[in-house]
């Protein structure tokens, strides 16, 4: 099958709901007699032996994540936990009807499965590493046992532009904070404040645009009120 056929698999795979897609990946490997492992976080590693003549080449890890951001239009009845995506293909473009596409990072998983399934490519030994819950904090990667991997060269397939390779990587940090809170009953008029209508955007690729952030604005608003 081609790359497009692999991508069109109708399996719900939102963050926190990756068991079904993870099990499909395991079944994919078993049907092709490929070595495979799956951990408690639903991370999957699929291994393909080197092509003839490439047995001594270093193992290459291909890595991507299988969860997606689940957003839909206001009038959509799509259930991300039960329904597959309604894909529309126009020429070279694939879109989803009324929902996010999941191209981040479904395209990486599709590429990896196409590579694993191909008998025409001449390649070194491949380890396809598919992690989970990337969109909500890299949770699958954090739970991964690195000893499962033999390769020392990793190609992350979760970038923004084709044809561009970035050497090294970006990192992340999670901070756990305990703030002392004293609650007291306050009498008087209550008011609900909503901040909406902002442009939104990607916190990584568009952070330099200095767009308004509702969390920051809410914090500033409360800070100013506290000083009144």
Set out the residue ranges of the language-model regions:
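Structural signal for hydrophobic packing residues in well-ordered secondary-structure cores
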Residues: 9, 29, 33, 70, ...
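Short, small-residue-biased leader/transition segments that mark boundaries at the very start
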Residues: 2-7
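Flexible, glycine/charged-enriched surface loops at secondary-structure junctions
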Residues: 38-39, 125, 225-228
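Midchain, well-structured core segments that form catalytic/ion-binding scaffolds
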Residues: 84-85, 90-99, 134-136, 141-228
């Amino acid at each position: 099958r081609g790359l497009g056929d692999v991508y069109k698999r109708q399996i719900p795979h939102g963050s926190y709901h990756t068991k079904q897609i993870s099990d499909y990946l395991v079944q994919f490997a078993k049907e092709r007699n490929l070595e495979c492992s799956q951990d408690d976080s639903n991370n999957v590693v699929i291994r393909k032996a080197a092509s003839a003549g490439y047995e001594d080449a270093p193992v290459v890890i291909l890595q991507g994540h299988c969860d997606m951001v689940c957003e839909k239009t206001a009038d959509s009845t799509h259930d991300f936990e039960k329904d597959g995506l309604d894909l529309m293909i126009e020429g070279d473009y694939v879109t989803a009807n009324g929902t996010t596409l999941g191209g981040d990072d479904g395209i990486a998983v599709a590429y990896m499965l196409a590579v694993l399934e191909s008998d025409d490519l001449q390649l070194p030994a491949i380890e396809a590493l598919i992690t989970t819950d990337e969109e909500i904090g890299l949770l699958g990667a954090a739970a991964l046992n690195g000893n499962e991997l033999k390769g020392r060269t990793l190609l992350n397939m979760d970038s923004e532009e084709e044809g561009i390779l970035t050497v090294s990587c970006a990192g992340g940090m999670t901070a756990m904070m305990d703030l002392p809170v004293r609650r007291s009953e306050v009498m008087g008029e209550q008011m609900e404040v909503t901040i909406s209508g902002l442009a939104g955007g990607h916190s990584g690729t568009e952070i330099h645009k200095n767009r308004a952030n509702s969390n920051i604005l809410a914090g500033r608003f409360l800070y100013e009120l506290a000083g009144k």
